[in-house]
Each structure stands twice: as C-alpha cells, then as structure tokens.
From Swiss-Prot:
GO molecular function: RNA binding
Classification via InterPro entries: Domain_X (IPR024937), Maturase_MatK (IPR002866), Maturase_MatK_N (IPR024942)
Coiled coil: none
Organism encoding this protein: Oenothera biennis
Protein's job: Usually encoded in the trnK tRNA gene intron. Probably assists in splicing its own and other chloroplast group II introns.
PANTHER family: MATURASE K
Cellular component terms (Gene Ontology): chloroplast
Protein family: Belongs to the intron maturase 2 family. MatK subfamily.
Entry's localization field: Plastid, Chloroplast
Protein name: Maturase K
BP term (GO), one: mRNA processing
Domain of life: Eukaryota
Keywords of the record: Chloroplast, mRNA processing, Plastid, RNA-binding, tRNA processing
Length: 512
C-alpha cells in the first residue's frame, strides 16, 4: 500500500463542505447560475405559475423552514410519523424540494469538476484512454471480435435509502446537511407514488436528485473496482482519475482503503492479472469482457458480489451474473442484438507449378435488428397488432393530414437512423411496411374512406416521403462515396439521445 499514498489521500481542503447555510440563502440561485449548475434552467426560474415545470429556490427555503416547524411533525403513539404539512400538494412540494436539494448538493462537486478541468485540461486533451458514451458502439465493433468471454451485469442499487446517504457522507462532511437530507428522503419517499421500496431509475419523469444519488453510488463502486482493474492490467490507464472527474465522478476517497484491510495488495493484483479486461457501463448496466479463461471471469464476478455485499450492503445473487462465450451468445445491447461470428475467406494461391486454396477464418461482430421486440413495441404503441399486421392509429380530430404523415415519417427515419450501424438492415423493411400501411389506414379512417381508394387518390407522394433514407442524405453530402459509405455501418453520435430509456428498447422512438 505504500506505493499508492497519493491515490488514497483525500485533499484536506475538501473535507468540510458546509452546505447547510446555503439551503436558506435566497441568493443561492445566482451562485448556482455563475458556476454552470443551471443544466436544467427551469430549476432556477423565479415567479412562475406552473411549478410542475418551474421551480424556485426561494420556495424551497420556505418549504424546508415549514418542514422543520414542530407543529407540522406529529409523532403518534405507535411511533409512526404523520405530516399534515404535505396535504393535497404532497407531489408538488416533494418535487420542488427534490429539485432544490439537487442544485444545492451538486454545488461542491461541480466546483471540484471545474477546478479539476482547468488544472488538467492539457492532460485530458493528450489522454488516449478517455472514453465517452459516443464511443460505445465503435468500441464493440473494434474490440469484441478479439475477445472470448462476456458477462452482462445489472448494477444493483441500494435497497435502503440510508445506504445512499452514507455514500454521500464520505463526500459531504456536513452533519447538518446530511441530517436534513435524511429527513427529506423519508418525507419524499412516503409521498412517492410507488409501493415498492426501491428506486426505479432512468424513467422519463425521474427526479434529478435521485439520479444524483445513483451517480454518487456508482462513483463509489467504480472507484474501487476500476482501481483494482487498472492496477492488475498490463496496460494501466494513466488518466482514470481525470476521466472520473470529467464525467461527474469527482475524486477517489480514502474509505476504499478498507477493502484491502488485512490483505496484501500485491497478491490482489496478481490474483486478477488480466491484460485484456474491458469494462463498459451504460445506464444501470455494465459489461465485462475478457480474452482470458472463464476462470478469471469467475474471480471478477465473485469479487463484484462481495464488493456490493460487504462494502455497500447490497445483496446480489452470483447465479444472476452469467458468463457467456461470445461466439455462442447474442448480447442485447441498447436495441441491438450483437454477437461474434466466424467468417470464412477463401484465397487462391498460385505458384509456377501448383495452385491451392487457403481458407482463412476471421471473427467479425454482427449487429442485427431485433425484429420481434420492434414489432412488440409497435404493437404497444398501437401501430399494429401482436402478429405485426398494421392497424389504424387513433388521432385527434384537428390533426391535419400533413401532421399525421410527418409523425409516421419521423418515426420511420428515427428507426433507420438508430439502426444504421446494423450489419443486416433488410429486416427494417418489414417495420417500414408496417408504419407506412398504418399511416395509410389512419388517414383512410380519418376521411372515412377505404385504403385502396385513399391510396389511389394520394398517389406516390406518401411513398416518396417514406423512401427518403440515409442513403439519399449521404448522396447529397458525399456524392462520390455515398454508395460505399451506406453499405457499411454508420454509427451516429446521437444514438444514445434517440434511445434514452433502457428496458423499453424502442419505446422512446415511437413516442416522438
């Protein structure tokens, strides 16, 4: 451990972030604005009527003051807490308080990010090991064909809210703020509309504050896991600390030393020695991939289980973390089915006297469109039935024909855009057929006409709208190379923005 003092040492100037007085200052919104904390500008707007969309930190201060008043917290005889303060506006107040807490608790971490970015901007520019979410798909294409084993892991979240507060305790050395946070979480959780005691992440309406709690937990977990991974790899990452701070994973904390208590750190490094271990995380899930034997993957699996269980008090069943061979397993990843296949390439070798054939087997990543899940999503969105037969979609009476057509065309283009990286795009023709015929049936239903009569009257205009694909756009931008480009994979940078919800792979596409 003596060779890593700088890694575990916590900056003493950051140990006493006293946030409690900031909660009651009405000028806090100006400080937040000056330091770039207004990513969601609606949080900081004042004097707005629609508080479901606009929040005021002045109102946050007043609500916290009322929450602390004794006559609003009544302790009943059986020990349960009743809070008539919330009343019929419990949803509204909890949302306002949640947004206010999110802005305040992000202040010290955002200041660290800005200072670290200014201090290490040159290192970030020179670092070859930084990765962002936009590089996930090219990473799969470049690296997965050279790997053998893969484990797809759902990152468990702390069941009890107290664990999330304890995670923040190592960052915020302010007992008053943590005490207020603990009270707020219990009040907010009681007013939350779900009966289950867990936090459902990555929903469209989820609060900024709960996402912040989740990110702090993931930062803590990855600080420990990736530190071990980097020290055990032959190709150690020299910029992991900068990488964490760049994406809101701010500092490594001294508490992770407890993981190695009573254990020789050099033994741990030799135990997990793996030159080709890759780690990818995306929206609550992670992928571990390796070129080594499945025995080493099993070691990493049980290390993760023990880390979650003993360090974060989160139970994770080892049997739910499967280790699969890439050649026999299809990875369901952000709306794609990906696997590694052997492709044979026959080369004829000619000499002066003989000729012979050489058969070369090469691994190649295949990404296919999940046609059945897509049809299921279309069925849930009322574009077709469960068997994939197009049906008319109910529309508003005041919708014009052009608005209806534009909506269907936009969905069709989003699908083509999102699956442009697929190696086999022919299955998308069926999806486009369903959308086109559903559009025609919707228009025919609106005009109280038959599909055949409406198509005859409309002519080829509708078909021209649906046939405009990436190939036509590329032909305008790259007239000489458009054919070669469109035949290959095209990974667009806004793919994660199109599919912003994991779990319903195509749900967000069909709602736009």
């Amino acid at each position: 451990m003596e060779e890593f003092p700088g890694y575990f040492e916590l900056d003493r100037s950051r140990q006493h972030d006293f946030l409690y007085p900031l909660i009651f200052r009405e000028s806090i919104y100006a400080l937040a604005h000056d330091h770039g904390l207004n990513r969601n500008r609606s949080t900081l707007f004042e004097n707005e009527v629609d508080y479901d969309k606009k929040y005021s930190l002045i109102i946050v201060k007043r609500l916290i003051t009322r929450m602390y008043q004794r006559n609003h917290l009544i302790i009943s005889a059986n020990g349960s807490v009743q809070n008539p303060f919330w009343g019929h506006n419990q949803n509204l107040y909890s949302k306002i308080l949640s947004e206010g807490f999110a802005v305040i608790v992000e202040i010290p971490f955002s200041l660290r990010v800005l200072s670290s970015f200014e201090r290490k901007e040159k290192d970030i520019a020179k670092s070859p090991t930084l990765r962002s979410i936009h590089s996930i798909f090219p990473f799969l294409e470049d690296q997965f064909s050279h790997l053998d084993y893969l484990s797809h892991v759902l990152i468990p979240y702390p069941i009890h809210l107290e664990i999330a507060v304890q995670t923040l305790r190592y960052w915020v050395k302010d007992a008053s703020s943590l005490h207020l946070l603990r009270i707020f979480l219990h009040e907010y959780w009681n007013s939350f509309s779900t009966p289950k005691k867990h936090i459902t992440l990555f929903l469209k309406g989820n609060s900024r504050f709960f996402l912040f709690l989740y990110n702090s937990y993931v930062c803590e977990y990855e600080s420990i896991f990736l530190f071990i991974r980097n020290q055990s790899s032959h190709f150690q990452s020299t910029s992991s600390g900068v990488f964490f701070e760049r994406i809101l994973f701010y500092v490594k904390i001294d508490h992770l030393v407890e993981v190695f208590v009573g254990t020789d750190f050099l033994d741990i490094r030799s135990f997990f020695k793996d030159p080709n271990m890759h780690y990818v995380r995306y929206q609550g899930k992670s992928i571990l991939a390796s070129k080594d034997t499945p025995l080493l993957m099993n070691k990493w699996k049980y290390y993760l289980v023990n880390l979650w269980q003993y360090h974060f008090s989160v139970w994770s069943q080892p049997g739910r973390i499967n280790i699969n061979q890439l050649g026999k397993y299809s990875l369901d990843f952000l709306g794609y089915f990906s696997n590694v296949q052997l492709k044979s390439s026959v080369v004829r070798n000619q000499t002066l006297e003989n000729s012979f054939l050489i058969n070369n087997a090469m691994k190649k990543l295949e990404t296919t469109v999940p046609i059945l899940p897509l049809i299921g999503s279309l069925s849930r969105a009322k574009f077709c039935n469960a068997l994939g037969h197009p049906i008319s979609k109910p529309t508003r009476n005041d919708s014009s024909d052009s608005d209806i057509i534009d909506r269907f065309v936009r969905i069709c283009r989003n699908l083509s855009h999102y699956h442009s990286g697929s190696s086999k795009k022919k299955s998308l023709y069926r999806i486009k057929y369903i959308l086109r015929l559903s559009c025609v049936k919707t228009l025919a239903r609106k005009h109280k006409s038959s599909v055949r009569a409406f198509l005859k009257r409309l002519g080829s205009e509708l078909g021209d709208e649906f046939l405009t694909e990436e190939g036509v756009v590329l032909a305008v931008i790259f007239p000489k190379a458009s054919g070669r480009l469109y035949r290959g994979r095209i990974w667009y940078l806004d793919i994660p923005c199109i599919n912003d919800r994991v779990g319903d792979a195509e749900g967000s596409i069909f709602t736009k």
